[in-house]
Amino acid sequence: MYINISSQKYDKPLLFITIGLIFIGIVMVFSSTVDRSFNKFDYSTFYISKHLIRVFIGALAMIFGMMLDYNYLKRLAGPFLIFSIFLLLLTKILYLAENGINSDPARWLNIGIFSIQTSDIARLSVIIYLANYIDRKKDNIRDYIDGFLPPLLMVLIVMILIIIQPDFSTAAMIGFIFLIMLFIGRAKFLHLVSTVFFGLIFLIPVMYFREYRVYRITSYFDGFFDLSKASHQLQQSFYSLGNGGINGVGLGS
C-alpha cells in the first residue's frame, strides 16, 4: 500500500510547528492587507480570502504527502527528475517558438486554465532525487567518481536549464540545497569546498551577465537611499521598525 494513515509515523513536532507557522502567516497577511483591501475593493477580506484558498490547497497537498509511503517516492525519484528536466526544456522551447529569442523570461508553462512554474517542480524533484541517491549510495558517497560526481552532474543540468530561463536565484537555491544535502549525507568536505569554489567561478560571471542581478545586490546594501522599486521591501522594513519597533504597532494598525 502506498497510502499510510497511521498517525504514529508522523513527525508530530514538525507538524505542530508547520501548523503554527500557517496560522501566524494568516494573521500577518490579514493584518497587513486589511486596509489596502478595503480601500481598493471596498471590503477588507479580498487578499486574505485568496490567501486562505492557497492555504487550503497547500494543506491538502501536505496531508496527501503525510499519508504517502515515502518508499514509493524512491521508485519515482529518477523518472520525476527526468520529467522535470523535460518540463524545463519544454517551457523554454515553447516560449521561444511563440515570442522569439529576445523575449521575456520563460519561467511559466501554460496548461489550459492554469500555469505552473517549472523550476519549482524541478526543485522538488532534485530534493527527492538527492534523498534517494544518498540513501542508496551512503557507503560510496565519499568517493568522488562513484559517489559525489553523478548527482553533481544531474543537478548541474537542472541548474543550467533554469539559468537560461533565466531564473538565477532559483538555480542558486538548488545549488545550495545540493550542498546542504550532500553535507548531511557525509560527503567529503573537500569535495563540497571545491564545488563551491568552481561554482563561484562559473556563477559570478553569469550573475554579471544580467544587469538586474547585480542591481538587486547593490540595492540591498544601499537600499535606503535607492528610491527605485528594487529597494521597496527593504525600505518598508526600515519604516516598520521605525514606527513600531520590535513589538510592532498592533494587529491591523
Question: Where do the model's predicted regions map?
Answer:
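Short, electropositive, low-hydrophobicity segments enriched in small/polar residues
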Residues: V29, M62, M173, F189-L190, ...
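Signal for well-folded cores of large energy- and translation-related assemblies
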Residues: M28, D135, I184, D222-F225, ...
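Hydrophobic alpha-helical segments of polytopic membrane proteins
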Residues: L60, G78-I85, I145-L161, F168-Y208
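Conserved phosphate/pyrophosphate-binding and hydrolysis machinery centered on Walker-type P-loop NTPases
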Residues: I162-Q165, S169, G223-L227
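Membrane-helix boundary/helix-loop-helix interface segments in multi-pass membrane proteins
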Residues: M1-F16, L21, V27-Q165
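Short helix-terminus and kink motifs of transmembrane alpha helices
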Residues: N71-K74, I128, N132, T170, ...
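Hydrophobic, glycine- and aromatic-enriched re-entrant/interface helices and adjoining loop segments
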Residues: N99-W108, H191-S253
